[in-house]
Amino acid sequence: MSVMVVTKFDAPASALEELVTGRHKETVLQLRDAAVAAGAIRHVFAEDTDGKLMVVDEWPSLEAFQAFFGTQPAIQQLVADAGVTGPPTTTTYRILDAPDRI
């Protein structure tokens, strides 16, 4: 079964939103295509209740996520340009094989 990877960054979500719809739009589209080719199932940027940046991904396995994330220098550049200065907090969840999944 797949995993959900939730990564939280100490940076305002609004900063990244401006970047991914502006000067880094082509970069995120290229990253999306590479992620799909590497097995990504879902990917969204989100804003938590404190206005901080979150990324929620679904991958076939944690190893597949780590292999992709660790080989994409464009990701590090993107988060740096969004004002991220410290390491993210990542939590992984195993997605249950439940009959009501959408």
Please provide the spans of the model-predicted regions.
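Short S/T/G/P-rich N-terminal loop/turn motif that feeds into the first structured element of a domain
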Residues: 1-73, 84-102
